[in-house]
Design a protein with these regions (language model features):
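Accessory RNA 3′-end/elbow-binding domains used by RNA modification enzymes
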Residues: 50-53, 111, 115, 133-205
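RNA pseudouridine synthases
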Residues: 1-156
């Protein structure tokens, strides 16, 4: 977003997200992803695919999730990763999140590739670690791609090469919010002077 569009960015980023991730079983790290320090290992033995599917299905719906200690969430005015880097102990609060759907795309040895649709604020790293624990293994997220944010899909995005070459389309605010309900205000002075607007739209406007 650029110029005036930055004022409405919060309404777009608050929508649901979709990711394609890979869970690696047998090794856990302090960051919950492949960039961290290994803290536990366990020899992997093949699991029954039906057992894996049943485990994943248990994570669909609303739940309390504990974020990774290496995250930007603030506790007492300080980011969690700052506590971690300083070697300080801190209680990591859980958050209410919702997993709308989970689809296993591929199972290959200790690697499970899956697609997940979830609410804003869901940590896929934590989801991977929690699923691994349910399956009886330490685990971490070894790969992550955000495939969709709200109505914006990755296949509709422009690459850096496209942008550098000038081959891209900049969405207008109207295009970006075309999937939102709209309320037309006849007199803009009503808004300017802060007058209450009556509407039968009870959600996003």
């Amino acid at each position: 977003c650029v110029n005036k569009a930055t004022k409405v960015l919060q309404f777009l980023t608050s929508e649901s997200k979709e990711y394609v991730a890979t869970l690696s079983l047998g090794t856990s790290t302090d960051t919950y992803d492949a960039s961290g320090k290994i803290i536990e290992t366990k020899e992997f033995h093949a699991l029954d695919n039906n057992e894996i599917v049943a485990c994943f299905n248990n994570f669909i719906g609303s739940q309390e999730q504990k974020p990774p200690i290496y995250s930007a969430i603030k506790v007492n005015g300080k980011k969690l990763y700052e506590y971690a880097r300083a070697g300080e102990q801190v209680e990591v609060p859980t958050r209410s999140v919702t997993v709308n759907h989970l689809e296993i795309l591929q199972i290959e040895n200790n690697l499970i590739k899956f697609k997940v649709g979830c609410s804003k604020g869901t940590y896929i790293r934590s989801l991977c670690v929690d699923i691994a624990k349910k399956l009886g293994y330490p685990g971490h997220m070894s790969k992550l791609i955000r495939s969709q944010s709200g109505h914006f899909r990755i296949e509709d995005c422009s690459t850096l090469e496209d942008i550098e070459a000038g081959h891209f389309h900049m969405l207008s605010i109207e295009e970006a919010f075309e999937h939102f309900d709209k309320y037309v205000i006849e007199d803009e002075n009503i808004v300017i002077h802060g007058k209450m607007i009556k509407s039968d739209i009870d959600h996003q406007v």
